[in-house]
Regions:
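Beta-strand-rich interaction surfaces with strong enrichment in secreted/lumenal proteins
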Residues: 68-73
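Surface-exposed loop/edge segments in extracytoplasmic proteins
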Residues: 64-66
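Exposed extracellular interaction/assembly regions and N-terminal maturation sites
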Residues: 1-58, 89, 94-96
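Short, low-complexity N-terminal tether/leader segments at secretion or assembly junctions of large
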Residues: 51, 58-62, 75-105
């Protein structure tokens, strides 16, 4: 089941989020602080607005793609999945059929 989010939110394992930055402008989705291996979070740009109102995915102390930086989604219609692998690698990004600006990874 997918849930619409229009403001800051802390995700939980299994979330499927329709992020609408057109309603209230750019905001942040924070990943869980104590994920288990295999936990997944899915995020879609429900309003095709990430290019003008970015969505930040805050790492909450864990890495994303092995990096110690938050992820900023800046391409409209972007959809990603994140799977937690380990403390070493952190969250791995699964990209859907839409483009993702990988310069932000």
């Amino acid at each position: 089941r997918w849930t619409v989010k229009t403001s800051a939110y802390t995700a939980v394992a299994g979330d499927r989020l329709l992020a609408d930055t057109a309603t209230t402008a750019a905001f942040t989705i924070t990943l869980p602080s104590a994920p288990a291996v295999g936990d997944e979070i899915h995020i879609l740009d429900s309003a095709a607005n990430f290019d003008s109102a970015n969505l930040t995915v805050a790492r909450n102390g864990k890495k994303i793609q092995g990096l110690t930086a938050d992820l900023t989604l800046t391409t409209e219609n972007t959809g990603i999945g994140l799977v937690f692998m380990s403390d070493t690698y952190g969250w791995r990004v699964l990209v859907d059929a839409y483009a993702v600006d990988t310069t932000e990874l």
